[in-house]
Amino acid sequence: MFEGVPDEDAWRNCTTLEGACELTARWLEGSLSYVPGYTAPQYAGENGPLSEALAAINRLGFLTDDSQPGKDVSGGNGQRAFVTGRCTEQAAAVISAVLVETDLVVLVFPPGEGGSGQICVTLDGEREFTWLGGSGGPSYAHETYTDWTNETLAKALKECWELQIFDPVWGRNAKLIPLLQKALITAKS
């Protein structure tokens, strides 16, 4: 799928969640230089194990659109590990069911619904810098993907469930990714 097609054309021709997940995985691995909504020519996050794990999560059917590793709070700076993205209703239900038995937090936004909460996940010099809990709802996904890809993919992603998953423990990285992968493997079986 999409072999030999220029990166932006691959996205313009992509029409499904599964295709978007595969293209995002390739971008995370560095074999694509373009992903919708991201203006840098390549993934600017943590390279190596984190980008590999995020690629695997995409290939399991969870279209990641934002993430960060955890960093211990020191000198007023710190991060909670998080991953946000979109998936099918079935995957959202399984992820929620698997992770509810852990101390990870899963915020779920069904298609057509937004949110306006604020949960701090990044401290910068003792001030809150990044938050989860808010969602642009279906119009955000539709506008973003219509502008950068095509109407068919935008409509498909508009029907997906949006999840924001984070570890409430500042600096911890050992739980979120493995448990999300476990939940997605369960959803696939």
Predicted regions and their residues:
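Active-site or metal-binding loop neighborhoods of secreted/extracellular toxin and effector enzymes
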Residues: 13, 105-189
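Short secondary-structure junctions
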Residues: 61-67, 103-111
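Helix N-cap motif at beta-to-alpha junctions
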Residues: 86-93
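Short, aromatic/basic amphipathic alpha-helical patches
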Residues: 93-103
